[in-house]
């Protein structure tokens, strides 16, 4: 089948981009790893299985278009990352005054727990069924749900920087936050913590991680995800359930194959603006903005159930820009690749969590678990908060002392 062959060709090109990244950066765990762990299984493996099991020949052109879009974006991103800025020679004296992250990780852990506590109190009968909490808090609880997840992710990342000082403390903080994240009914951030940690080892500690470690990581994640689907969806084959669950591309194909009128950037604008306004501030905020409008049009039953509407991947961009979608992807890919390289250089130069958070965001690991909008300004604010918090130490006299920055 032509679609399967093209997906396989795209996978070969991704392998080439990864080997290129390894050769230039000298790291097995590099900028491509989040894409390999998160995106490749979803967009290529599971969707490939779905295409193989289903009759989609009538949508061949649409499938080829969107897989071309996928390759266009990742190629633009990786090439701009690798070739737009030289890697500086770092001066060891630049990392002399290291920030302190024990207090920072404790602070953000405390905030994550306190913010989510009202939800746990209200839905305490569902604590052993976190997915039910997730379903019941889709509307009106974002002011508790998302900040709590965000602070848990930030706390875990800050805890990484205490790993060399105290492994027990680091593991305890990360484990507590993973349990708290699990109680949100959202499994995605836990994988983000794992990916962030191996990137920390590679870019902060400069560990020479072997390729087999990456292979074993893939295997462990595959087992966990398969077990999750086997437990959650008791009917049918877990592999088929995963293939049916990874519906980004086929939903985008649904948009492209319909007579949907182009929105000329309206959906993108709504995703960038409306998603930033809490419903507590704007009670009358529309339910059908951005990609949710597509869900309302194409999956009205799921939309009105309000328990998580289907995602559309690049279908949202296609609804706005049509055949000009690849042009947008090239521009955004190059821009984000340049940003990622800048923050990569700063991360390796300063060994600091605030730059590391920005680097993670630029390569696809967001600490704000919101699917809409490009949350770069918000991540800058979070990075600044981490910078301020890490400038304090908890002294032996039980007081906070602002560290002087000797320049």
Swiss-Prot record:
Its EC number is 2.4.99.27. GO terms for molecular function: transferase activity. Signal peptide: none annotated. It comes from the Bacteria. The chain crosses the membrane at residues 2-22, 31-51, 63-83, 101-121, 141-161, 168-185, 190-204, 211-231, 319-339, 356-376, 382-402. Keywords: Cell inner membrane, Cell membrane, Lipopolysaccharide biosynthesis, Membrane, Transferase, Transmembrane, Transmembrane helix. It is a multi-pass membrane protein. Pathway: Bacterial outer membrane biogenesis; LPS O-antigen biosynthesis. It is an enzyme of class 2 (transferase). It catalyses: n lipid-linked O-antigen repeat units = a lipid-linked O antigen + (n-1) polyisoprenyl diphosphate. Its main location: membrane. It is found in: Cell inner membrane. GO terms for cellular component: plasma membrane. One of its GO terms (biological process) is lipopolysaccharide biosynthetic process. NCBIfam families: glyco_rpt_poly. Polymerase involved in the biosynthesis of the lipopolysaccharide (LPS). Catalyzes the polymerization of the O-antigen repeat units on the periplasmic face of the inner membrane, leading to the formation of the lipid-linked O-antigen molecule. This is O-antigen polymerase.
